[in-house]
């Protein structure tokens, strides 16, 4: 045994197991501006004190393990360990607590969402001492944010590229999502864009299947884009899904899209992975492509209130990793989404500085230090009667995306697009004239029906459609 080993082994090391809270629960700790801060909803197993549970989360997501180890003496735990610095009860929940954990910045690789999540939401979520664990929010410090490129272009650059201002953008997901040939798919794209939409979209699971290979789809969609642009005089786009089985194949598809001269590609960022997403975002910035992000698989992670991760964390991660659009729920459509919580993470996507606001689920003040913003996309079970509410909720910097609400029009795809464009223009004009969309929305739509038979037909078809189911993931304190 070397003298150095003898010295280290003899200075204060004692083998065995000790409580996590003795090392990792530090209520006296004052957080630093460079710390990554996390708010965890912790449900300890019966008999496990909240302080021990919170300390266990801090330990197992940073430097700790289940027993003391000799090599702790070879580093500075005080410099590198995570710290549970505050615990508070959850209103109305006797067995749940919010544990606040601070992580030193040196624990994380620069510019890597993958590495950040591997620590913070890694093995600790399977820890036996916890009945359930959910990451509610993260504070990303400016020092770490500055190591990321973020969205390829951002909101203002996108508007300049499209020459579209003063209103939400309109989109449509082509349906049926699977089974169409590339030529019929391109036809639907053309009809929707010609009818007045700004964008059409590949559904998230359209990649390169036997019925429609990706290269054929890209070619027919590009033809549809150029034809509709020539006929309308407007700039158009189609989200060509570049998601693939390998990063190399994904980039190959993005390269082909750029060669066709289209303006935007798409990625499924959770199923594709953050490493792939960041790589694609870098390619898109370097080559002038906008990047639309779909959040397929998010509800597996974020829907249950006591375990997993809230979507506001996934939204922050996407802004770091890179994307110009991301699906963010609708509040009024068929998919899960509490209004105040949704508005909270919509602001976190778009704004440069967002204050702590627990009434909207925002646990920490977030300074994005001029990282470009992301357009929230409202999509899922929406139609023309929802247009006033969507315009009022999401504002101008958003994409309102009607799939069935366009293609389900009784007269066809182009009239469906016309109906949505007329409804949107009517709502924007009414808002600009000072009318209250929340109160007068239905009246505004009825007035517009008088001079748009396409809108009148759409209103008749969907007048009884409602998705009145309670939200599962409500903010704390809501009934």
From Swiss-Prot:
It is an enzyme of class 4 (lyase). Its cofactor is Mg(2+). Its EC number is 4.1.1.39. Its main location: plastid. The basic functional RuBisCO is composed of a large chain homodimer in a 'head-to-tail' conformation. In form I RuBisCO this homodimer is arranged in a barrel-like tetramer with the small subunits forming a tetrameric 'cap' on each end of the 'barrel'. It catalyses: 2 (2R)-3-phosphoglycerate + 2 H(+) = D-ribulose 1,5-bisphosphate + CO2 + H2O; D-ribulose 1,5-bisphosphate + O2 = 2-phosphoglycolate + (2R)-3-phosphoglycerate + 2 H(+). It is found in: Plastid, Chloroplast. Heterohexadecamer of 8 large chains and 8 small chains; disulfide-linked. The disulfide link is formed within the large subunit homodimers. The record marks 334 as: Transition state stabilizer. GO terms for molecular function: magnesium ion binding; monooxygenase activity; ribulose-bisphosphate carboxylase activity. This is Ribulose bisphosphate carboxylase large chain. Mg(2+) binds at residues 201, 203-204. Keywords: Calvin cycle, Carbon dioxide fixation, Chloroplast, Disulfide bond, Lyase, Magnesium, Metal-binding, Monooxygenase, Oxidoreductase, Phosphoprotein, Photorespiration, Photosynthesis, Plastid. The disulfide bond which can form in the large chain dimeric partners within the hexadecamer appears to be associated with oxidative stress and protein turnover. Residues 1-2 form a propeptide. One of its GO terms (cellular component) is chloroplast. It comes from Barbarea verna (Land cress). It holds the Pfam family RuBisCO_large. The keyword 4Fe-4S does not apply. The modification Phosphothreonine is found at residue 330. The modification Phosphoserine is found at residue 208. PROSITE patterns: RUBISCO_LARGE. The modification N6-carboxylysine is found at residue 201. GO terms for biological process: photorespiration; reductive pentose-phosphate cycle.
């Amino acid at each position: 045994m070397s003298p150095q080993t003898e010295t280290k082994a003899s200075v204060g090391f004692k083998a065995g197991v000790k409580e996590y809270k003795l090392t990792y629960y530090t209520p006296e700790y004052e957080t630093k501006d460079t710390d990554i801060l996390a708010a965890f909803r912790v449900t300890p197993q019966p008999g496990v004190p909240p302080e021990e549970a919170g300390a266990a989360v801090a330990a197992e997501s940073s430097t700790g393990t289940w027993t003391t180890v000799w090599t702790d003496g070879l580093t500075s735990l005080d410099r590198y360990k995570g710290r549970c610095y505050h615990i508070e009860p959850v209103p109305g929940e006797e067995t749940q607590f919010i544990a606040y954990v601070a992580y030193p910045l040196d624990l994380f690789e620069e510019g890597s969402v993958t590495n950040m999540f591997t620590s913070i939401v890694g093995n600790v979520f399977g820890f036996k001492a916890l009945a359930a664990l959910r990451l509610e929010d993260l504070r990303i410090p400016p020092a770490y944010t500055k190591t990321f490129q973020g969205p390829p272009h951002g909101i203002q650059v996108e508007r300049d590229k499209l020459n579209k201002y003063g209103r939400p953008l309109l989109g449509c997901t082509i349906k049926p999502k699977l089974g169409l040939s590339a030529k019929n798919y391109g036809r639907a794209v053309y009809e929707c864009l010609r009818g007045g939409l700004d964008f059409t979209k590949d559904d998230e699971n359209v990649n390169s299947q036997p019925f429609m290979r990706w290269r054929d789809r890209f070619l027919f969609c590009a033809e549809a884009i150029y034809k509709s642009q020539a006929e309308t005089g407007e700039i158009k786009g189609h989200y060509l899904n570049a998601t693939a089985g390998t990063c190399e194949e994904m980039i190959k598809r993005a390269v082909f899209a750029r060669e066709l001269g289209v303006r935007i590609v798409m990625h499924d960022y959770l199923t594709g992975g953050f490493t792939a997403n960041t790589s694609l975002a870098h390619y898109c910035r370097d080559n002038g492509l906008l990047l639309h992000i779909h959040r397929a698989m998010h509800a597996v992670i974020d829907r249950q209130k006591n375990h997993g991760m809230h979507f506001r964390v996934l939204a922050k991660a996407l802004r770091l990793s890179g994307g110009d659009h991301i699906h963010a729920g609708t509040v009024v459509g068929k998919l899960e989404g509490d209004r105040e919580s949704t508005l909270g993470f919509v602001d976190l996507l778009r704004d440069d500085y967002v204050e702590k606001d627990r009434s909207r689920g925002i646990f920490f003040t977030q300074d994005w230090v001029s990282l470009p913003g992301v357009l929230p996309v409202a999509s899922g079970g929406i139609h023309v009667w929802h247009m006033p509410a969507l315009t009022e909720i999401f504002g101008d910097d958003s994409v309102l995306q009607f799939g069935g609400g366009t293609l389900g029009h009784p007269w066809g795809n182009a009239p469906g697009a016309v109906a949505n464009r007329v409804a949107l223009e009517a709502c924007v004009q009414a808002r600009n004239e000072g009318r209250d969309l929340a109160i007068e929305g239905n009246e505004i739509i009825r007035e517009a029906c008088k001079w748009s038979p396409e809108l009148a037909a759409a209103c008749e078809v969907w007048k009884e459609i409602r998705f009145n189911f309670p939200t599962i993931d409500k903010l704390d304190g809501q009934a």
